[in-house]
Each structure stands twice: as C-alpha cells, then as structure tokens.
Swiss-Prot record:
EC number: 2.1.1.170
Amino-acid positions noted as binding S-adenosyl-L-methionine in the UniProt annotation, renumbered to this chain: 78, 83, 129-130, 144
Protein name: Ribosomal RNA small subunit methyltransferase G
Superkingdom, taxonomy of origin: Bacteria
Function: Specifically methylates the N7 position of guanine in position 527 of 16S rRNA.
Top-level class of the enzyme under EC nomenclature: transferase
Source organism per UniProt: Pseudomonas savastanoi pv. phaseolicola (strain 1448A / Race 6) (Pseudomonas syringae pv. phaseolicola (strain 1448A / Race 6))
UniProt key word Methyltransferase: yes
Keyword list, A-Z: Cytoplasm, Methyltransferase, rRNA processing, S-adenosyl-L-methionine, Transferase
Predominant location category: cytoplasm
Compartments where found: Cytoplasm
Length: 211
C-alpha cells in the first residue's frame, strides 16, 4: 500500500528535481504507484519488489527526464510497467504519449492504469517495436533500460525522422554502445542525472538521425 512516507518522498524528490507537481499530478502519481504495487505481485511488472524503493527507482527516476522532454508526441518503447511513459503522460496532459510493449500482461496493466487514472492522452500499443508502424513520425522516442543503443535505434528508426529525438535512459555511461551506433545516428548530448534516493550512476543520452 501507499504510505504517507511515500507521498512525502515523492513531493520532496520532485522539488529536488526542480519539478513543481500540482496536487492532482501528485495524487495521480501515487495512484499509479498503488496500482503498480498491487499488480506487480501477480504480473511481475518490475524486479523492484519493495514498495519503499519504488518512489525513487520508478517515479523519481522517470521524472528526472522531464526537463529534457520537447514536442508533444512521444512513444515509450519497451515500456514494461509504464516507466517513464505514464509519469510523462501525467506531467504533460496537453501532450500525447504512447506506450509500446510486446508483453500482453504488461499492456493489460498499462490499459488498467489509463482507465483508472483517466489518462485520455495515453495510448497503449501491444506490439513488437519493429512491427509497429506509426502514421506520422514521433517528436520523441524514449526507452528505459530497454536494450543496447544499437538495437534501440535499429528497432525504432522507422518511428522517427531527422526532427525526432531518441532518449535512452541508462545506468553507466555506455561508451561501448556508442561505438556501435548505426552510421546514420549520432549522439546529440549526454547528461548525468541525479535521482533523489537512488544509488549508482544514471545517464540520459539524446540521439538524433542524420538522414
């Protein structure tokens, strides 16, 4: 269950990240956390079993990329339990966020969150990345610990164009993966992230297509 300590940790952590949550956004994020805790027992949505670790390792980790979000149409590839896409949809109600995952249990959970939190700007897509064909390119494509940079860009290149930004959330800075980037992608910028309550390194890599 969600406790007052979880609520306080979320408020304090968001402020440390420079994010001013509205009361409604704070409530929605905690409602999402409650669903994640409940469904994780049966659906194995995340390897993090301890609810006391979920605020920092899931909610605040997802919120840490908010300052880097530009544009209005985003897709979270390999979304799993909905991170970071669901927190993004809560923070950017005027935008459109798609969650893509090939695991039916995980997309069922995502759909339940969409319904219970009334996230009309959230779309859930049950598909493999390479099989999904968007009607128009996305402004941004994001993944969190999804795959290597080579696979991430290779499986999603058809979802974007030269104006799209690919955001890869990583732990250690993946120097070896950058060497293997496809020739038509380049590293636009890299950012070391500090996530309140999280130990270890966190990095955000922003990639672009050159053609």
């Amino acid at each position: 269950m969600v406790t007052p300590q979880h609520a306080q940790e979320l408020s304090t952590g968001a402020r440390e990240l420079g994010i001013d949550l509205s009361p409604a956004q704070h409530e929605q994020l905690l409602a999402y956390l409650a669903l994640l805790i409940k469904w994780n027992k049966a659906y194995n949505l995340t390897a993090v079993r301890n609810p006391d670790e979920m605020v920092s390792r899931h909610l605040l980790d997802s919120l840490s990329v908010v300052p880097f979000i530009e544009g209005t149409r985003w897709i979270d590839v390999g979304s799993g339990g909905g991170m970071p896409g669901i927190p993004m949809a809560i923070l950017f109600p005027e935008g459109k966020v798609a969650l893509l995952d090939s695991n039916g249990k995980k997309t069922r959970f995502q759909t339940q969150v969409k319904l219970e939190l009334k996230l009309d700007n959230l779309e859930v897509i049950h598909s493999r990345a390479e099989s999904y064909q968007p009607e128009v390119p996305f402004d941004g494509i994001i993944s969190r610990a999804f795959s290597s940079l080579e696979d991430f860009t290779g499986w999603t290149r058809h979802m974007g164009d030269v104006n799209t930004r690919w955001l890869a959330m990583k732990g250690l800075h993946p120097d070896d993966e950058l060497v293997a980037l496809p020739s038509d992608f380049h590293l636009d910028s890299a950012h070391a992230l500090t996530v309140p309550g999280c130990q270890g390194q966190r990095h955000l890599l922003i990639l672009r297509r050159t053609a």
